[in-house]
A protein has these predicted regions:
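Anionic-ligand binding patches
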Residues: 2-5, 11-203
Length: 203
């Protein structure tokens, strides 16, 4: 394994990924940087299924390219589960209210749906499933989670997505108020990447 391709065009994710996997001693590329153009339909019913679909489809393309035939392809599917809302938005987190809708609007809509709901019923978690499609055709998948509650207002500038409404009681702040290194330590994606890292270290 000399290269890792992460099947995303999300620059925020790439910053987190590189921070956690950088000392593996391999080149880490986004799908765009690898020159792979593909719009994979994620039609699975779980985070894990969607991550595996994306990783294996991009790996099929990568293995046809001489420079990436030995690359590992990683893909994630992540989202927010709010218990009071029957785990919505769940696997539809990025598509909630439409993919072109800003997260300021999405976050406010979720706060409005939870108006008057007490903190003990506002439990939620971020989930991140990460799949690793190996050059030998095998695929492994792991899950990372971060538990918290949905706050009462949009707070914080450091994160993205639903971070500004995801409150961590033990730290007294939202995920969007955490310093980047602390977020990598605590986050669902950080946990998933650390699990994948252990798998990759054995390859």
């Amino acid at each position: 394994m000399k290269k890792i391709i992460f099947a995303t065009g999300n620059e925020h994710k790439m910053v987190e990924i590189r921070a956690i996997l950088s000392d593996l001693g391999v080149e880490i590329l986004s799908q765009k940087e690898a020159g792979i153009k593909a719009d994979v339909v994620e039609d699975g019913s779980t985070f894990e299924e969607n991550a595996m679909i994306k990783a294996t489809e991009i790996a099929k393309i990568a293995c046809q390219m001489p420079e990436y035939k030995d690359a590992v392809v990683l893909a994630d599917d992540s989202g927010l589960e709010i218990d009071y809302l029957n785990k919505e938005p769940g696997i539809y987190s990025s598509r909630y209210m439409g993919e072109d809708t800003s997260y300021d609007i999405k976050n406010q809509a979720l706060l409005d749906r939870l108006e008057g709901v007490p903190d003990e019923k506002r439990t939620a978690r971020f989930v991140c499933a990460i799949a690793a499609a190996m050059p030998d055709g095998s695929c492994e998948v792991v899950r990372g989670t971060m538990e918290g509650i949905i706050g009462h207002e949009i707070v914080g500038e450091n994160g993205f997505g639903y971070d500004p409404i995801f409150f961590l009681p033990e730290y007294g702040c939202t995920s969007a108020e955490l310093a980047p290194d602390k977020k990598n330590e605590l986050s669902h994606r950080g946990e998933g990447l650390k699990k994948i890292r252990k798998i990759l270290e054995q390859k």
